[in-house]
Each structure stands twice: as C-alpha cells, then as structure tokens.
Curated annotation (Swiss-Prot):
Name assigned to this protein: Transmembrane and coiled-coil domain-containing protein 2
PANTHER family: TRANSMEMBRANE AND COILED-COIL DOMAIN-CONTAINING PROTEIN 2
Protein species of origin: Mus musculus (Mouse)
Primary site of residence: membrane
Membrane-traversing stretches: 54-74
Coiled coil segments of this chain: 127-150
InterPro entries: TMCCDC2
C-alpha cells in the first residue's frame, strides 16, 4: 500500500484560512504567503458592530426588491424575458455598488478611499473629454469640407435680380423690396 505524504500543514492552512474574518486575508495567505495566526484587530467602533446588520439589510432589501420587480413583470406579461433579465442585472449592480461602498467604508473609515475613486473618475472624465474633443474636431473638419463644396458649386457670376420684384437668390446684394411697412 503506497504511503501518502502528510498533508497536515495544508489542512492546518485551510482551517486557519477558513477561520479568518475576511476573504481578503485568506487570499493574502494563499497567494502572498502571509500567515498570521490571529486576525488583526480593528478599531472601527460602532461601524464594526453595524457591519453584519447592514449587510443583512442590504441582502434582504435586494431580495425583496427582486421579488417585487419579478412579480410586477410577471403579472404584466411573460413574453418579455429580456426586461426581466435587465431588471435583475440592474438590481444586482445596485446591490454590488452599495455593498462595495460599504466595504470601502469598513476598510477605511476616514474616507480616503473615496478620494482614490474620485481620482479614477477624473481620469475617466479626462479620457471622455479627449474623445469628445476628437469627435468635435472631426465634425469641424467635415463642416469645412462642406463649406468648400458649397463655395465651389456657387456660380462665379452674380445674377441680375433688379428685374425681379422679390429676389430669393442667396447672392443678391440688394435689399428686398418691402410692402410699405418698415421696422
């Protein structure tokens, strides 16, 4: 009968990882190799005590809104599966954003994590502004080209509009006759 190598150290690592308070600590222990026997103490005060309750409230509200929305869509019509799927995806994204915001708040209660997110939004905004500027420059070039085409098609000689009572041509330099009323 073959003998298997002892794997008590990997079982111990697995049990230690399962005993940790967050998945982040477990990921650090597995991939980076940090092994701390006790979780690091945090001093979050009331936020530390409210974290499980808020996450449960977020989960319950997500499931409640999901049930209400699905019931409303089902009562209305079953033919639109795409609307139901879009509703579920949107609701899940809202839940994830709320949960992520709460996790950032738990990780850094001073609020500097929000500043990092704002910096990312600034870079995103700058990239979007660059794209808009390029599109505007492209439109401006097309307008110039169209103006050139219009000028090229315009007749070189001006028409004599003096014989017509009301001139409707665009290259007439004389003012239009009025009906006696002046403004």
């Amino acid at each position: 009968m073959p003998t298997f190598p002892t794997t008590t150290s990997s079982w111990d690592n697995l049990l230690n990882a399962l005993a940790r308070s967050s998945i982040w600590n477990w990921l650090q222990a597995m991939f980076i190799g940090e092994t701390t026997s006790a979780p690091q103490p945090t001093n979050l005060g009331i936020l530390d005590n409210l974290a499980p309750a808020v996450q449960i409230i977020l989960g319950i509200s997500f499931l409640t809104l999901l049930a209400i929305g699905l019931f409303a869509l089902w009562k209305r019509s079953i033919r639109s599966i795409q609307k139901i799927v879009m509703f579920v995806i949107t609701l899940y994204q809202l839940y994830k954003k709320g949960s992520d915001f709460f996790q950032v708040l738990l990780a850094n209660p001073e609020g500097s994590g929000r500043q990092i997110q704002d910096n990312n939004n600034i870079f995103l905004s700058l990239g979007l502004q660059e794209k808009i500027l390029k599109k505007l420059q492209m439109v401006e070039n097309k307008v110039r080209d169209l103006e050139g085409i219009i000028v090229a098609r315009k007749p070189a000689s001006k028409r004599d509009c003096s014989s017509e009572p009301y001139c409707s041509c665009s290259d007439c330099q004389s003012p239009l006759p009025t009906s006696g009323f002046t403004s």
